[in-house]
Amino acid sequence: MKAAISLIIFFAILFVVIEAISYEEGKELFQKERAECVGDGQRCADWAGPYCCSGYYCSCRSMPYCRCRSDSGK
């Protein structure tokens, strides 16, 4: 019985450690992506980057000249 409880506790701790590591990696990737964004009127490509910063969307009125536009003007 003690072995089963110990095994359950071991796997619970292992799960928590794995989740903490994957959360930190995801957070780091998100911050890196936000640092490489472009602003209003700059060239963008939603499918491959560079991506528009928060508050902007990629508008492709004439391919391949896509530009970041403000979300407020939609």
UniProtKB/Swiss-Prot annotation:
Main location: secreted
One Pfam family here: Toxin_7
Keywords from the named record: Amidation, Disulfide bond, Ion channel impairing toxin, Knottin, Neurotoxin, Presynaptic neurotoxin, Secreted, Signal, Toxin, Voltage-gated sodium channel impairing toxin
Organ and tissue specificity: Expressed by the venom gland.
Annotated signal sequence range: 1-20
Locations listed in the record: Secreted
Propeptide residues according to the Swiss-Prot or TrEMBL record: 21-34
One GO CC term, this protein: extracellular region
Function noted in UniProt: Insecticidal neurotoxin that induces an irreversible spastic paralysis when injected into insects. Modifies presynaptic voltage-gated sodium channels (Nav), causing them to open at the normal resting potential of the nerve. This leads to spontaneous release of neurotransmitter and repetitive action potentials in motor neurons.
Domain remark from Swiss-Prot or TrEMBL: The presence of a 'disulfide through disulfide knot' structurally defines this protein as a knottin.
Family recorded in the similarity comment: Belongs to the neurotoxin 07 (Beta/delta-agtx) family. 02 (aga-3) subfamily.
Protein name: U3-agatoxin-Ao1b
